[in-house]
Swiss-Prot record:
This is Heat shock protein 67B3. GO terms for molecular function: unfolded protein binding. Residues 188-199 have a biased composition (Low complexity). Gene3D superfamilies: 2.60.40.790. The gene is Hsp67Bc. The keyword Endoplasmic reticulum does not apply. SUPFAM superfamilies: HSP20-like chaperones (SSF49764).
Protein backbone atom coordinates (compact mmCIF):
# COMPACT_ATOMS: atom_id res chain seq x y z
CA UNK A 1 0.00 0.00 0.00
CA UNK A 2 1.54 3.34 -0.99
CA UNK A 3 2.21 6.04 1.56
CA UNK A 4 -0.67 8.43 2.12
CA UNK A 5 0.47 11.86 0.85
CA UNK A 6 -0.96 13.95 3.66
CA UNK A 7 0.72 11.71 6.24
CA UNK A 8 4.06 12.56 4.69
CA UNK A 9 3.12 16.23 4.82
CA UNK A 10 2.39 15.88 8.52
CA UNK A 11 5.97 14.71 9.01
CA UNK A 12 7.18 18.10 7.81
CA UNK A 13 8.39 20.56 10.51
CA UNK A 14 6.23 23.22 8.85
CA UNK A 15 3.07 21.22 9.34
CA UNK A 16 0.18 22.85 11.22
CA UNK A 17 0.09 19.81 13.51
CA UNK A 18 3.56 20.54 14.85
CA UNK A 19 3.95 23.26 17.40
CA UNK A 20 5.87 24.07 20.54
CA UNK A 21 3.53 21.88 22.57
CA UNK A 22 4.12 18.56 20.81
CA UNK A 23 2.87 16.80 23.94
CA UNK A 24 0.15 19.07 25.42
CA UNK A 25 -0.83 16.34 27.86
CA UNK A 26 1.92 15.93 30.48
CA UNK A 27 0.62 12.53 31.56
CA UNK A 28 0.74 11.32 27.96
CA UNK A 29 4.33 12.48 27.65
CA UNK A 30 5.36 10.82 30.91
CA UNK A 31 3.77 7.53 29.92
CA UNK A 32 5.12 7.30 26.38
CA UNK A 33 8.19 9.44 25.84
CA UNK A 34 10.46 7.23 27.97
CA UNK A 35 9.03 3.77 27.43
CA UNK A 36 10.65 1.24 25.12
CA UNK A 37 8.13 1.91 22.40
CA UNK A 38 8.53 0.99 18.74
CA UNK A 39 7.21 4.37 17.65
CA UNK A 40 9.21 7.55 17.46
CA UNK A 41 8.20 10.61 19.46
CA UNK A 42 6.93 12.51 16.42
CA UNK A 43 4.57 9.68 15.53
CA UNK A 44 3.32 9.46 19.11
CA UNK A 45 2.69 13.19 19.16
CA UNK A 46 0.80 12.94 15.89
CA UNK A 47 -1.42 10.20 17.28
CA UNK A 48 -2.07 12.24 20.40
CA UNK A 49 -3.34 15.14 18.28
CA UNK A 50 -5.36 13.19 15.72
CA UNK A 51 -7.00 10.72 18.11
CA UNK A 52 -7.41 6.97 18.19
CA UNK A 53 -8.99 6.81 14.72
CA UNK A 54 -5.69 7.71 13.10
CA UNK A 55 -3.64 4.85 14.55
CA UNK A 56 -3.79 2.92 11.26
CA UNK A 57 -1.88 5.73 9.53
CA UNK A 58 1.28 4.76 11.38
CA UNK A 59 1.44 1.47 9.47
CA UNK A 60 2.41 3.39 6.36
CA UNK A 61 5.66 4.65 7.84
CA UNK A 62 8.63 2.58 6.75
CA UNK A 63 10.48 0.77 9.52
CA UNK A 64 13.70 2.55 8.70
CA UNK A 65 12.11 5.90 9.47
CA UNK A 66 11.21 5.02 13.06
CA UNK A 67 13.59 6.25 15.72
CA UNK A 68 15.74 3.51 17.23
CA UNK A 69 16.66 5.22 20.49
CA UNK A 70 13.57 4.08 22.39
CA UNK A 71 14.24 0.40 21.70
CA UNK A 72 18.01 0.61 21.61
CA UNK A 73 19.66 1.28 18.27
CA UNK A 74 22.88 -0.45 17.20
CA UNK A 75 24.96 1.09 14.45
CA UNK A 76 28.48 1.30 13.08
CA UNK A 77 29.71 4.88 13.23
CA UNK A 78 33.28 6.02 12.62
CA UNK A 79 34.35 2.40 12.54
CA UNK A 80 32.88 1.62 15.99
CA UNK A 81 29.97 -0.60 16.98
CA UNK A 82 27.60 1.59 19.02
CA UNK A 83 24.43 1.01 21.02
CA UNK A 84 22.24 3.86 22.32
CA UNK A 85 19.38 3.04 24.69
CA UNK A 86 16.97 5.28 26.59
CA UNK A 87 16.99 4.06 30.20
CA UNK A 88 15.76 7.21 31.91
CA UNK A 89 13.26 5.32 34.07
CA UNK A 90 16.02 3.36 35.81
CA UNK A 91 18.64 4.31 38.37
CA UNK A 92 22.31 3.56 37.55
CA UNK A 93 22.36 0.74 40.12
CA UNK A 94 19.38 -0.91 38.40
CA UNK A 95 21.24 -1.39 35.11
CA UNK A 96 23.74 -4.04 34.04
CA UNK A 97 25.74 -4.45 30.84
CA UNK A 98 27.25 -7.88 30.16
CA UNK A 99 28.92 -9.78 27.34
CA UNK A 100 27.31 -13.22 26.98
CA UNK A 101 28.23 -15.55 24.10
CA UNK A 102 29.42 -12.67 21.91
CA UNK A 103 26.25 -10.69 22.60
CA UNK A 104 26.03 -7.43 24.52
CA UNK A 105 23.21 -7.88 27.02
CA UNK A 106 21.65 -4.83 28.69
CA UNK A 107 19.27 -5.43 31.56
CA UNK A 108 17.29 -2.99 33.65
CA UNK A 109 15.09 -3.91 36.57
CA UNK A 110 13.52 -2.14 39.50
CA UNK A 111 11.07 -3.49 42.02
CA UNK A 112 7.61 -2.07 42.53
CA UNK A 113 7.65 1.54 43.64
CA UNK A 114 5.28 4.46 43.67
CA UNK A 115 5.29 7.24 41.10
CA UNK A 116 2.83 9.95 40.04
CA UNK A 117 0.47 7.39 38.51
CA UNK A 118 0.50 4.62 41.12
CA UNK A 119 2.75 1.64 41.80
CA UNK A 120 4.89 0.24 39.00
CA UNK A 121 7.73 -2.25 38.47
CA UNK A 122 9.81 -2.47 35.30
CA UNK A 123 12.13 -5.03 33.73
CA UNK A 124 13.70 -5.24 30.28
CA UNK A 125 16.48 -7.20 28.56
CA UNK A 126 18.09 -6.19 25.28
CA UNK A 127 20.56 -8.33 23.33
CA UNK A 128 22.85 -7.02 20.61
CA UNK A 129 24.99 -9.55 18.69
CA UNK A 130 28.55 -8.24 18.46
CA UNK A 131 30.15 -8.84 15.05
CA UNK A 132 33.47 -10.68 15.09
CA UNK A 133 35.36 -7.74 13.64
CA UNK A 134 34.96 -5.73 16.86
CA UNK A 135 37.10 -5.96 19.99
CA UNK A 136 35.03 -7.47 22.80
CA UNK A 137 37.83 -6.72 25.30
CA UNK A 138 37.53 -2.97 24.73
CA UNK A 139 33.81 -2.37 25.36
CA UNK A 140 33.06 1.02 26.93
CA UNK A 141 29.69 1.84 28.52
CA UNK A 142 28.60 5.31 29.66
CA UNK A 143 25.36 6.68 31.12
CA UNK A 144 24.47 10.31 30.38
CA UNK A 145 22.77 12.64 32.84
CA UNK A 146 19.58 12.61 30.78
CA UNK A 147 19.29 8.80 30.93
CA UNK A 148 20.84 7.56 27.69
CA UNK A 149 23.05 4.47 27.90
CA UNK A 150 25.83 4.52 25.30
CA UNK A 151 27.93 1.45 24.51
CA UNK A 152 30.92 1.73 22.17
CA UNK A 153 33.07 -1.11 20.84
CA UNK A 154 36.14 -0.32 18.69
CA UNK A 155 37.14 -2.54 15.78
CA UNK A 156 39.83 -5.17 16.11
CA UNK A 157 43.30 -4.03 15.06
CA UNK A 158 45.33 -6.70 13.26
CA UNK A 159 49.03 -7.09 13.97
CA UNK A 160 49.81 -6.21 10.37
CA UNK A 161 48.40 -2.74 10.91
CA UNK A 162 50.65 -2.04 13.91
CA UNK A 163 53.45 -0.20 12.14
CA UNK A 164 54.44 1.94 15.11
CA UNK A 165 54.41 1.63 18.88
CA UNK A 166 55.87 3.59 21.78
CA UNK A 167 58.75 1.97 23.69
CA UNK A 168 58.68 3.03 27.36
CA UNK A 169 61.90 4.34 28.93
CA UNK A 170 62.73 2.78 32.28
CA UNK A 171 64.91 4.67 34.77
CA UNK A 172 67.75 2.59 36.30
CA UNK A 173 70.96 3.16 38.28
CA UNK A 174 74.42 4.28 37.01
CA UNK A 175 75.51 2.93 33.66
CA UNK A 176 78.45 0.48 33.25
CA UNK A 177 79.47 2.01 29.94
CA UNK A 178 81.76 4.63 31.45
CA UNK A 179 84.77 2.39 32.22
CA UNK A 180 88.53 2.60 31.55
CA UNK A 181 90.35 0.45 29.07
CA UNK A 182 91.03 -2.38 31.59
CA UNK A 183 87.38 -2.94 32.16
CA UNK A 184 87.44 -1.15 35.52
CA UNK A 185 85.35 1.83 36.33
CA UNK A 186 87.19 5.13 36.25
CA UNK A 187 88.18 6.34 39.68
CA UNK A 188 86.28 9.28 40.95
CA UNK A 189 87.77 12.32 42.70
CA UNK A 190 87.53 10.66 46.13
CA UNK A 191 89.53 7.60 45.01
CA UNK A 192 92.32 9.75 43.50
CA UNK A 193 92.78 11.66 46.74
CA UNK A 194 93.34 8.47 48.76
CA UNK A 195 96.26 7.21 46.62
CA UNK A 196 99.82 7.71 48.18
CA UNK A 197 101.88 10.50 46.70
CA UNK A 198 104.82 9.42 44.48
CA UNK A 199 108.32 10.17 45.92
Amino acid sequence: MPDIPFVLNLDSPDSMYYGHDMFPNRMYRRLHSRQHHDLDLHTLGLIARMGAHAHHLVANKRNGELAALSRGGASNKQGNFEVHLDVGLFQPGELTVKLVNECIVVEGKHEEREDDHGHVSRHFVRRYPLPKEFDSDAIVSTLSEDGVLNITVPPLVSKEELKERIIPIKHVGPSDLFQNGNGHKEAGPAASASEPEAK
